[in-house]
Amino acid sequence: MLSRAIFRNPVINRTLLRARPGAYHATRLTKNTFIQSRKYSDAHDEETFEEFTARYEKEFDEAYDLFEVQRVLNNCFSYDLVPAPAVIEKALRAARRVNDLPTAIRVFEALKYKVENEDQYKAYLDELKDVRQELGVPLKEELFPSSS
């Protein structure tokens, strides 16, 4: 319909088909870009650490295969905080439930890179020592002492 109107009316034809300078297009795009932008994250409340812990404990309990365990681990460690020892324990139990020892070992590797210093890492290891022994999860440092 629009094409018929353009070609019927010579005045519209000349104004619509006329080349416009590039600066006008850039200004116009900039204005429209700012008008159309929205803040989607503004509508959500911030999640507390306790809510984060409860959510990931539940997700690790519900993980039914290796893909789900690794997906939840990836999401859990993508936040800008270190998961609680209870979450790490659930992650280890989920990895062993799906019978994947390498993922359980990688949980500790991820934890090592996530904590701020070596003392925090040692505190996590002390906290999770019984769980590690129960599930038979060695550390990478124990398996390959020369590479760490």
Swiss-Prot record:
Name of the protein in its database record: Cytochrome c oxidase subunit 6, mitochondrial
Other information: Present with 12500 molecules/cell in log phase SD medium.
Pathway entry: Energy metabolism; oxidative phosphorylation
Native organism: Saccharomyces cerevisiae (strain ATCC 204508 / S288c) (Baker's yeast)
Bilayer topology annotation: Peripheral membrane protein
GO MF annotations in UniProt: metal ion binding; oxidoreductase activity
GO biological process entries: mitochondrial electron transport, cytochrome c to oxygen; proton transmembrane transport
Subunit record text: Component of the cytochrome c oxidase (complex IV, CIV), a multisubunit enzyme composed of 12 subunits. The complex is composed of a catalytic core of 3 subunits COX1, COX2 and COX3, encoded in the mitochondrial DNA, and 9 supernumerary subunits COX4, COX5A (or COX5B), COX6, COX7, COX8, COX9, COX12, COX13 and COX26, which are encoded in the nuclear genome.
Annotated function: Component of the cytochrome c oxidase, the last enzyme in the mitochondrial electron transport chain which drives oxidative phosphorylation. The respiratory chain contains 3 multisubunit complexes succinate dehydrogenase (complex II, CII), ubiquinol-cytochrome c oxidoreductase (cytochrome b-c1 complex, complex III, CIII) and cytochrome c oxidase (complex IV, CIV), that cooperate to transfer electrons derived from NADH and succinate to molecular oxygen, creating an electrochemical gradient over the inner membrane that drives transmembrane transport and the ATP synthase.
InterPro entries, A to Z: Cyt_c_oxidase_su5A/6, Cyt_c_oxidase_su5A/6_sf
Keyword check for Membrane: yes
Signal peptide limits: none
Keywords: Heme, Iron, Membrane, Metal-binding, Mitochondrion, Mitochondrion inner membrane, Oxidoreductase, Transit peptide
Transit peptide range per the UniProt entry: 1-40
